[in-house]
C-alpha cells in the first residue's frame, strides 16, 4: 500500500500540469509516446491523452474529483468526453485501460499492435486477468498475424484484422539497391538487469564471420538519439570489437529507412529484424541468454511456438560456434530463390506484409 502511495505521489510531482482544457478534436491518441497514425492523419487532428505521467490536465482532474471519481479510467473517460472525438486510437496493445474506453465513453476504439508479443504476456495476469473477455472490448484491432489474433480473440471482444506491422507496411525496400553489408541491431541496455547478456558476444562472432567473408560489419545502436547512453553503448561493444565495426549514427532517418539499405540484418531478438524479414531482407536471429534472463521469452518464434532452432535462427544458453556459423551462412550464402522458398512459411507465421 505504501509503495503504491509513494508511486502515486512521485507520479503527481513528476508530471507537467496544464490548466488549459484539452483541444476538441477528431481523434484522441492514448499515449503520445508513439504515433504511427501520423502518416495518415494530420498532426493537428490529434489530441493526446498522456498516460505515463508526462502531463496531467488540472481541469479534467478537478471535474473528476467533484464527481467523486478517482480512478485512472475515470480521468481518461472525462478527458475523452471533453474532446468529443470520432475515434480513440492507440499503438500500445498492452494498455488494459484502453479496452474499457469504448464501453465507458460510447466512442469507437482502434488499436494497432506495435511490437512482437511473447509468452510472458500470455502467462501474466497483469495484462489480462481471468475472464477479461467479459469486460475488455475494442472495436478494431490491427494485428501482426493469425497467432496473435487467436490470442487476443480469447482475451478481448472486438473485430480483429491481420495486417502485419502497421508502420512496416509503409517502408518497402528496393532489394536490388541494398548494400551487401551486415547490420547488427543492438539491444544494449544500461540497466543492470541482465537484459543485454551476451549481446557483445553475438556481435563479436558476427563481426569475425563478416570479416572472413569480406563483408562490412555495422551496428545499429539502440540509443543513437541519446548521446549520454550512446557513449556507454559504444564502449560496451568496443571492449570486445576493438573498433572493428561501424556505428550507424544517422539521427535524421528512422530505423526503417536505415535498415532498408542493407541486405543482411542480424539480432538477438528484435521486432525490427522480423519486420525486415517480412519485407524480403535477409534476417538472422542468434540469441545466447540464460533461461532466467527477463528477455529469454523474446526469442524469435517464441509466441508462435516455433522450435528454438531453425534455418535462420538459434536460441542458445551458451556459445556454440557451429550454430552461429550455420545461421550466418544460411542468411549470407543461400541463393535468392531458395531463401524465398524456405522463409515464406515463417514470414507468414510472424507477419503479414
Annotate each PLM feature.
Residues 234-251:
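Nucleotide-activated donor-binding/catalytic signature segment of Leloir-type glycosyltransferases, i.e.
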Amino acid at each position: 500500500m505504501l509503495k503504491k502511495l509513494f508511486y502515486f505521489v512521485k507520479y503527481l510531482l513528476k508530471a507537467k500540469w496544464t490548466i488549459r482544457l484539452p483541444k476538441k478534436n477528431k481523434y484522441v491518441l492514448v499515449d503520445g509516446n508513439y504515433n504511427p497514425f501520423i502518416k495518415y492523419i494530420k498532426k493537428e487532428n490529434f489530441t493526446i491523452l498522456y498516460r505515463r505521467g508526462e502531463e496531467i490536465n488540472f481541469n479534467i482532474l478537478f471535474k473528476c474529483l467533484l464527481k467523486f471519481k478517482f480512478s485512472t479510467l475515470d480521468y481518461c473517460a472525462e478527458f475523452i468526453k471533453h474532446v468529443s472525438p470520432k475515434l480513440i486510437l492507440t499503438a500500445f496493445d498492452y494498455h488494459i485501460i484502453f479496452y474499457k474506453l469504448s464501453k465507458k465513453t460510447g466512442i469507437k476504439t482502434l488499436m494497432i499492435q506495435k511490437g512482437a508479443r511473447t509468452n510472458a504476456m500470455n502467462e501474466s495476469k497483469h495484462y489480462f486477468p481471468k475472464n477479461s473477455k467479459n469486460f475488455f472490448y475494442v472495436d478494431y484491432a490491427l494485428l501482426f498475424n493469425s497467432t496473435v489474433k487467436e490470442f487476443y480473440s480469447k482475451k478481448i471482444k472486438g473485430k480483429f484484422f491481420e495486417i502485419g506491422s502497421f508502420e512496416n507496411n509503409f517502408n518497402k525496400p528496393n532489394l536490388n539497391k541494398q548494400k551487401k553489408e551486415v547490420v547488427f541491431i543492438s539491444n544494449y541496455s544500461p540497466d543492470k538487469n541482465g537484459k543485454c547478456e551476451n549481446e557483445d558476444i553475438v556481435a563479436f562472432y558476427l563481426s569475425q564471420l563478416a570479416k572472413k567473408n569480406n563483408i562490412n560489419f555495422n551496428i545499429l545502436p539502440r540509443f543513437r538519439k541519446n548521446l549520454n547512453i550512446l557513449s556507454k553503448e559504444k564502449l560496451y561493444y568496443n571492449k570486445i570489437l576493438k573498433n572493428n565495426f561501424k556505428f550507424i549514427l544517422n539521427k535524421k532517418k528512422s530505423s526503417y529507412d536505415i535498415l532498408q539499405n542493407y541486405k543482411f540484418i542480424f539480432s538477438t531478438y528484435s521486432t525490427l529484424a522480423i519486420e525486415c524479414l517480412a519485407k524480403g531482407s535477409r534476417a538472422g536471429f542468434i540469441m545466447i541468454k540464460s533461461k532466467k534472463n527477463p528477455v529469454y521469452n523474446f526469442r524469435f518464434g517464441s509466441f508462435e511456438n516455433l522450435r528454438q532452432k531453425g534455418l535462420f535462427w538459434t536460441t542458445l544458453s551458451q556459445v556454440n560456434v557451429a550454430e552461429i556459423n550455420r545461421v550466418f551462412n544460411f542468411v549470407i550464402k543461400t541463393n535468392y530463390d531458395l531463401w524465398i522458398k524456405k522463409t515464406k512459411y515463417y514470414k507468414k507465421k510472424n507477419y503479414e506484409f
